[in-house]
Amino acid sequence: MIKRYPTRKIKVGNVDVGGDAPISVQSMTYSKTKDIESTLDQINRLYFAGADIVRVAVLDEEDALALKEIKQKSPLPVIADIHFNYRLGLKAAEVVDGLRINPGNIGGKERVKAIVDACKARKIPIRIGVNAGSLEDHLENKYGQTPKAMVESALWHIKFLEDLDFFDIKVSLKASDVQRTVEAYRMLRPLVDYPFHLGVTEAGTKFHATIKSAAAFGALLLDGIGDTMRVSITGELEEEIKVGKAILKDLGLSKEGVNIISCPTCGRIEVDLPPIVEAVEEATKHIKKPLNLAVMGCVVNAIGEAKEADVAIACGKGYGLIIKKGEIIGKYKEEELLEKFLEEVKKESE
């Protein structure tokens, strides 16, 4: 069992982050926030995909003014992403559930203090978001875009807020590659007790982002590091949630949903297995109950693998077997096998 680092618990709307709270999965809309209809449409898509928290960009006054209606209609806690203009942070803090800022680019201490005071008044948290590509000049000149520079930046920003008597803090340390990201989080973890937001920034398209995020998050989460996370994908929003939840499930940190076991295929296979597995994935993606399903291309491996599965199919030429909890319950023609299998899955999911 993974032993998580003890961190202080904060609240983002109705979602606990840190402490003994489940690791939450979040994403960010890509619409112009001032386009309220499009932004809410994306938030609803994320909600139905299983997201826990959403972040929106606030670039100008119109974006800030749109936040009130978005927050009122959003099914998810809303975090506002603020850069450079502290006045936008003040307006956002009046209505949203949290801010993401870089204290170093907001302006002088008085401006940061104004934002902190606004967040204190509503008891909403601030995420300090450090990115390797946008470090302070003096740190980059001294260390380069290294984990050490990222950690020093985070510690400086944390102290900045602590000196203002503010402690509802989350921290992220993102680079665009796995090694620097993992090293930075590992370096900072023993030094503070604030919850960590995990992410690999600019991770790329679905394929590359999935690989990078699984590698980085897997390494960190197995070490007990991480309280909330975003898989950054250049692509559809729902994929970020799908991949994030799959990472948590495969690490044993989430019990929700279906786990599909399928063979990689070999010379024994006598059916076209990939379309069958894809059909099972599509038909079961809505199931919340934890179920192990096995889709095997021959009888040789199926009997053994099926012992671990709630429901399994062993596909053969012209026919196949359905197995429940290690017991064969039926033999069916190939053309009806998938339908019969899904009927048994539905029974188990109810």
UniProtKB/Swiss-Prot annotation:
Coiled-coil stretches are: none
Question: So what does this thing catalyse?
Answer: (2E)-4-hydroxy-3-methylbut-2-enyl diphosphate + oxidized [flavodoxin] + H2O + 2 H(+) = 2-C-methyl-D-erythritol 2,4-cyclic diphosphate + reduced [flavodoxin]
**What keywords were assigned to this record?**
4Fe-4S, Iron, Iron-sulfur, Isoprene biosynthesis, Metal-binding, Oxidoreductase
Q: So which cofactors does this thing need?
A: [4Fe-4S] cluster
E.C. number, please?
1.17.7.3
EC top class, as a word = oxidoreductase
Pathway info = Isoprenoid biosynthesis; isopentenyl diphosphate biosynthesis via DXP pathway; isopentenyl diphosphate from 1-deoxy-D-xylulose 5-phosphate: step 5/6
* Gene3D superfamilies (UniProt xref): Dihydropteroate synthase-like, Sulfite Reductase Hemoprotein, domain 1
Q: Which GO terms describe its molecular function?
A: 4 iron, 4 sulfur cluster binding; 4-hydroxy-3-methylbut-2-en-1-yl diphosphate synthase activity (ferredoxin); 4-hydroxy-3-methylbut-2-enyl-diphosphate synthase activity (flavodoxin); iron ion binding
Sequence positions that bind [4Fe-4S] cluster? 263, 266, 298, 305
What InterPro entries does the database record attribute to this sequence?
Answer: Dihydropteroate_synth-like_sf (IPR011005), Enolase-like_C_sf (IPR036849), IspG_bac (IPR016425), IspG_bac-typ (IPR004588), NO2/SO3_Rdtase_4Fe4S_sf (IPR045854)
* One record GO biological process: isopentenyl diphosphate biosynthetic process, methylerythritol 4-phosphate pathway
NCBIfam families, from UniProt?
ispG_gcpE, PRK00366.1
Q: What does this protein do?
A: Converts 2C-methyl-D-erythritol 2,4-cyclodiphosphate (ME-2,4cPP) into 1-hydroxy-2-methyl-2-(E)-butenyl 4-diphosphate.
Return the protein name.
4-hydroxy-3-methylbut-2-en-1-yl diphosphate synthase (flavodoxin)
Q: Which organism is it from?
A: Nautilia profundicola (strain ATCC BAA-1463 / DSM 18972 / AmH)
Q: What is the lineage of its organism?
A: Bacteria, Pseudomonadati, Campylobacterota, Epsilonproteobacteria, Nautiliales
